[in-house]
């Protein structure tokens, strides 16, 4: 078997946008509007991602390539095709941070925490192997361990591991990941999940190889003060009229420039939205195909840069981040909940997020950004527990609601999110 090979895809995801957007203005009412916008874009993302969720999918950035093992090494470490017939006593989970660990600790029925790296589920010891993603360390560690999976002692085998959207196909398109149907998980079990979360981890043979508890729909995150000053309102439904499609968006950019605002911080802010809405793959019949929507991004971006309505900064750069503050004079960014919760200086005095100054609306097109998926490792000797964790943590509606309330995740369960949106007592 060949070692996992890197495949490009989209980036990362974590939480929904309710926590910080509207701290001081019509708080409960606006939060419901934000959640409504997220629900809308989640449905749009589900309709669109199928065009790009394969090896040939467009991507904003590829993860660093993990070293590929030699053919000889791969051939000598063939992974067992079937899970063990007897359940093991040690359950090994590989991930890159504490997020899933905290979800399992807090929400999986019967989980007992022993210490920072160990837990118990019944008679089974849960061991957490957490390697940060810095310098590709997580993937390197995971790759090296998967290559030894077939020959590993039962207590050392990986049972479950996590992947992100940007490199999911690297693992999905190998035999190191189990089809969820082989775990006994049916289409009916997953019927309430957003389709795009399935498309991202479906291999080239149509097998679903992972399941996520999260949804990461993206929205247009706008500066409410700028909206009031230039558009006359910061109401999401009214702001949406000024950004409802790309032509309207670019027309609004002219108004923002006249008032001293950049429409977006950088042309790179909009790339993911355009690229999530392509009609086909990068490679078709052996030929590179550049989608019309990507060419529209090029044309629209050039016009906006030439008109000095935006910049060309790299995402995550200091210049790109200046718009997190009022003096940065940026009207909007595009992203899911984790962007504002973790990346827009929400805890920093004087930032727009800290002052409750961001609003959200659907924007010109639906899109998603990121996500974390649970994969069962081929060769696991704990297939029944892998199945139960996936079902409990991604399909149990009560647990999904618990996660929304406790962790502010936008969960991958349509009835749960619709119920939370309608629940007048819910405030994040």
Question: PLM ranges: what are they?
Answer:
Residues 248-257, 286-318, 357:
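Glycine-centered hinge/linker elements that transmit conformational signals in sensory
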Residues 165-181, 195-238, 250, 266-287, ...:
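Periplasmic solute-binding protein
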Residues 75, 79-83, 136-139, 150, ...:
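Hinge/lid segment of periplasmic solute-binding proteins
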Residues 46-50:
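C-terminal motif of bacterial Sec signal peptides marking the signal peptidase cleavage site
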Residues 6-29:
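Short, Lys/Arg-enriched N-terminal segments with co-localized hydrophobic residues
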Residues 14, 36, 52-169, 187, ...:
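Conserved N-terminal structural module of periplasmic/extracytoplasmic solute-binding proteins
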Residues 130-144, 244-248, 312-326:
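Short helix-initiation/N-cap motifs at beta->coil->alpha
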Residues 89, 122, 147, 347-416:
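Extracytoplasmic/periplasmic substrate-recognition and gating elements
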């Amino acid at each position: 078997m060949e070692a996992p090979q890197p495949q490009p895809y989209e980036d990362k995801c974590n939480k929904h946008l309710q926590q910080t957007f509207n701290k001081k203005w019509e708080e409960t009412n606006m939060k419901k509007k934000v959640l409504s916008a997220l629900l809308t874009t989640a449905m749009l993302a589900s309709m669109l991602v199928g065009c790009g969720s394969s090896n040939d999918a467009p991507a904003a950035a590829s993860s660093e390539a993990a070293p590929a093992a030699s053919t000889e090494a791969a051939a000598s470490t063939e992974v067992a095709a079937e899970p063990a017939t007897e359940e093991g006593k040690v359950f090994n989970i590989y991930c890159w941070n504490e997020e899933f660990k905290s979800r399992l600790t807090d929400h999986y029925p019967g989980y007992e925490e022993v210490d920072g790296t160990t837990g118990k589920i019944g008679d089974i010891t849960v061991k957490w192997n957490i390697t940060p993603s810095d310098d590709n360390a997580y993937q390197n560690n995971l790759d090296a361990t998967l290559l030894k999976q077939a020959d590993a002692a039962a207590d050392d085998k990986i049972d479950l591991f996590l992947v992100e959207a940007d490199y999911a196909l690297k693992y999905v398109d190998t035999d190191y990941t189990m089809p969820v149907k082989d775990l006994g998980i049916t289409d009916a079990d997953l019927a309430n999940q957003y389709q795009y979360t399935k498309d991202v981890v479906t291999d080239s043979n149509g097998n679903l190889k992972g399941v996520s508890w999260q949804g990461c729909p993206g929205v247009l995150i706008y500066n409410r003060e700028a909206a009031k000053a230039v558009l006359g309102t910061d109401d999401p439904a009214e702001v949406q009229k000024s950004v409802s499609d790309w032509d309207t968006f670019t027309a609004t950019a002219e108004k923002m420039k006249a008032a001293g605002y950049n429409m977006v911080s950088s042309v790179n802010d909009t790339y993911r939205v355009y690229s999530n809405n392509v009609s086909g793959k990068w490679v078709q019949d052996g030929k590179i195909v550049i989608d019309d929507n990507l060419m529209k991004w090029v044309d629209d971006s050039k016009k906006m840069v030439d008109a000095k309505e935006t910049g060309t900064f790299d995402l995550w750069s200091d210049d790109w981040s200046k718009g997190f503050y009022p003096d940065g004079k940026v009207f909007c960014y595009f992203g899911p909940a984790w962007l504002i919760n973790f990346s827009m200086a929400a805890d920093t005095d004087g930032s727009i997020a800290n002052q409750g100054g961001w609003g959200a609306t659907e924007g010109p097109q639906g899109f998603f950004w990121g996500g974390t998926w649970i994969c069962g490792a081929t060769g696991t000797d704990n297939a029944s527990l892998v199945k139960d964790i996936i079902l409990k943590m991604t399909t149990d509606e009560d647990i999904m609601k618990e996660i929304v309330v406790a962790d502010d995740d936008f969960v991958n369960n349509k009835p749960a999110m619709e119920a939370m949106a309608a629940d007048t007592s819910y405030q994040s």
